[in-house]
UniProtKB/Swiss-Prot annotation:
The keyword Flavoprotein does not apply. This is Prefoldin subunit beta. Heterohexamer of two alpha and four beta subunits. NCBIfam families: gimC_beta (TIGR02338). The gene is pfdB. InterPro entries: PFD_beta-like (IPR002777), PfdB (IPR012713), Prefoldin (IPR009053).
């Protein structure tokens, strides 16, 4: 049975949306992982009694002022939080569109039988 052109188009949109949604979820997960790592680094630095910490730079460790490194990490945390929030909003919109398209396709496919 040949599917009508509009249904084929919807199926193609559905598959593309599914791929985009998976990519958004993957990217969001990557940023969430980085965010947790940064937060853990800040937490560990706060436990340290020293005013200096070592920071990895290009494969070597460099002694740095703890307050400066903490400020850098805090800025990175803020940036990552914004990115995660952005990806969450995108994911939510795409998930809604995905569900709508899925329901529409189920309806059309159900009528064709």
């Amino acid at each position: 049975m040949e599917l009508p052109a509009n249904v084929q188009n919807q199926l193609m949109q559905f598959q593309q949306l599914q791929q985009q949604l998976q990519m958004i979820m993957y990217q969001k997960q990557q940023f969430e992982t980085q965010l947790k790592e940064m937060e853990k680094a800040i937490e560990e630095m706060e436990k340290s009694g020293s005013d200096e910490v070592f920071k990895m730079a290009g494969g070597i460790l460099i002694k740095r002022n703890k307050a400066e490194v903490k400020e850098e990490l805090s800025e990175k945390v803020e940036t990552l939080q914004v990115r995660v929030t952005t990806f969450e909003k995108q994911e939510e919109k795409m998930q809604k569109r995905y569900t709508e398209l899925q329901e529409s396709l189920q309806k059309v496919m159900g009528q064709g039988q």
